[in-house]
């Protein structure tokens, strides 16, 4: 994931363009990623190496829905059954690596703003990121808000209860304690409301 080029894309769109990954669409919100046809308990899904489990038993909100592209520095995909670093599973898995602030950046204050609109579902989104950076410490905050009405099917029929609204907020800080030692803290919150399936 390149932060500059893909910050406007959803995680679903980033995963959908990855070889070996297909997405299961059950509604307008949160497509479920599969690795070579395997999903759920057959694949490992982690955020910064931390094992995650979906809250919904029918997989309507997969782990990939808890992060946004502006939270991420990269998405690591393992296509095989071995992954010593984040745990093994029969189908491989994903590790969503959170973006970290940069110590000693060229500018003390930097950031970005973005907005997007999709005609189907009258969907819009807005995002922001700000970073403060010194040689010994840095902090970064990012947020995104997305809202969509019911979308239209291929035959131009309204799919009822396919609306959603969500916001996502992340903050990360890092302090250099010694020459080769740093302390970092991450916070990520994702809230969805009025989500129809």
Regions found by a protein language model. Give the residues of each.
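Flexible loop and strand-edge segments within Gram-negative outer membrane beta-barrel domains
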Residues: 160-162, 180-197
């Amino acid at each position: 994931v390149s932060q500059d080029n893909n910050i406007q894309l959803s995680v679903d769109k980033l995963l959908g363009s990855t070889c070996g990954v297909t997405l299961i669409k059950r509604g307008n919100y949160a497509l479920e990623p599969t690795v070579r046809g395997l999903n759920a308990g057959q694949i490992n899904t982690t955020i910064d190496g931390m094992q995650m489990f979906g809250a919904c038993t029918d997989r309507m909100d997969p782990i990939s829905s808890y992060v946004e592209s502006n939270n991420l520095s990269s998405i690591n995909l393992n296509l095989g059954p071995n992954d010593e670093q984040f745990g093994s599973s029969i189908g491989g898995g994903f590790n969503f690596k959170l973006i970290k602030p940069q110590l000693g950046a060229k500018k003390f204050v930097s950031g970005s703003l973005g907005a997007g609109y999709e005609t189907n579902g009258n969907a819009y989104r807005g995002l922001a990121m700000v970073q403060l950076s010194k040689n010994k410490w840095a902090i970064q905050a990012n947020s995104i808000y997305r809202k969509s009405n019911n979308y239209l099917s291929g035959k131009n029929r309204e799919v009822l209860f396919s609306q959603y609204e969500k916001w996502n907020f992340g903050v990360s800080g890092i302090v250099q304690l010694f020459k080769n030692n740093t302390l970092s803290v991450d916070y990520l919150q994702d809230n969805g409301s009025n989500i129809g399936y």
